[in-house]
Amino acid sequence: MHHRNDSQRLGKAGCPPEPSLQMANTNFLSTLSPEHCRPLAGECMNKLKCGAAEAEIMNLPERVGTFSAIPALGGISLPPGVIVMTALHSPAAASAAVTDSAFQIANLADCPQNHSSSSSSSSGGAGGANPAKKKRKRCGVCVPCKRLINCGVCSSCRNRKTGHQICKFRKCEELKKKPGTSLERTPVPSAEAFRWFF
């Protein structure tokens, strides 16, 4: 019987619906549609890029407790009620959350550049001091290059699991030479080179 009265009360045209039911019937988050949030988020990012993030943070206490403060938080995945409650109870925490998330968004935008520069510098290895250096390749015509299998007895073959060096009997003659010795130089004995000092 009590349920009928509630349903009759809702069905009456003359009675205005209760405020809680009215809130449930209408979308109270309609102001936060994606079309409205995107321009605000873009505006926030433009301010961050221009260095005017401080101005946005200074204006925060005026906006604390309103739904318009939510897009400035940078898309935190908490429900809107939790953010609003946090902002209402502690404006300092809300401004800290805005600054943290704003800088987090800015840092995420910079991440691909940082990762690409660090990976290119770390891939150089031990000889990465001069990035213009080309990797030396085997000639393919000398006797060690023509050998197809490892010997299995040299130190490089025995340490195959830990070391990454080629078999000593398969190492190219060109690679045995140091890169700077490709020019023909006559060897000079050390005593004769400094004979004019004595």
From Swiss-Prot:
Acts as a negative regulator of the Wnt signaling pathway via its interaction with DVL1. Binds preferentially to DNA containing cytidine-phosphate-guanosine (CpG) dinucleotides over CpH (H=A, T, and C), hemimethylated-CpG and hemimethylated-hydroxymethyl-CpG. This is CXXC-type zinc finger protein 4. The keyword Transferase does not apply. A zinc finger (CXXC-type) spans 132-173. The keyword Iron-sulfur does not apply. One of its GO terms (molecular function) is methyl-CpG binding. Zn(2+) 1 binds at residues 139, 142, 145, 172. InterPro entries: CXXC4/CXXC5 (IPR040388), Znf_CXXC (IPR002857). The CXXC zinc finger mediates binding to CpG-DNA. GO terms for biological process: negative regulation of Wnt signaling pathway; Wnt signaling pathway; zygotic specification of dorsal/ventral axis. Keywords: Cytoplasm, DNA-binding, Metal-binding, Wnt signaling pathway, Zinc, Zinc-finger. GO terms for cellular component: cytoplasm; cytoplasmic vesicle; nucleus. Zn(2+) 2 binds at residues 151, 154, 157, 167. Residues 114-134 are annotated as: Disordered. It comes from Homo sapiens (Human). Interacts with the PDZ domain of DVL1. It is found in: Cytoplasm. Residues 161-166 are annotated as: Interaction with DVL1.
